[in-house]
Amino acid sequence: MIEQHPKQGKIQTRNYAGPWRKTPGRLLGTGLIRLYQITLSNFIGNQCRYMPTCSEYTYEAIARHGLWAGAWMGLFRIVCCNPFGTHGFDPVPTSLGSSYYFYKPWCYRKISTKHNK
């Protein structure tokens, strides 16, 4: 992602740099993902089979769709990221659609796997 900075030009960032509402849940979720990226991710190494990586995907999903939906989307993505799972380019959808409800989190699995079939 490339972010515009008024004085320095373009800055390369690791996570989603688009506009998103800064609600407490989203700030908590993205903060925890960022903490993981700074600490544990460096020790584990880059072993993700997807582009963007699972932590970048979860960060963007939480930023775009909120803590509840974004965390479920990220969880299903992480579960699929294994040697027997899928791989490739899997972007976060820009909108969820009308068939996704907060009380049916298993529907979010369809979003994270439909790009790779």
Swiss-Prot record:
Superkingdom of origin: Bacteria
Signal peptide extent: none
Keyword terms: Cell inner membrane, Cell membrane, Membrane
Coiled coil spans: none
A cellular-component GO term for this protein: plasma membrane
Keyword field contains Methyltransferase: no
Entries under SMART domains matching the protein: Haemolytic
Protein purpose: Could be involved in insertion of integral membrane proteins into the membrane.
Assigned protein family: Belongs to the UPF0161 family.
The protein's name: Putative membrane protein insertion efficiency factor
Organism of derivation: Bartonella bacilliformis (strain ATCC 35685 / KC583 / Herrer 020/F12,63)
Lineage, highest ranks first: Bacteria, Pseudomonadati, Pseudomonadota, Alphaproteobacteria, Hyphomicrobiales
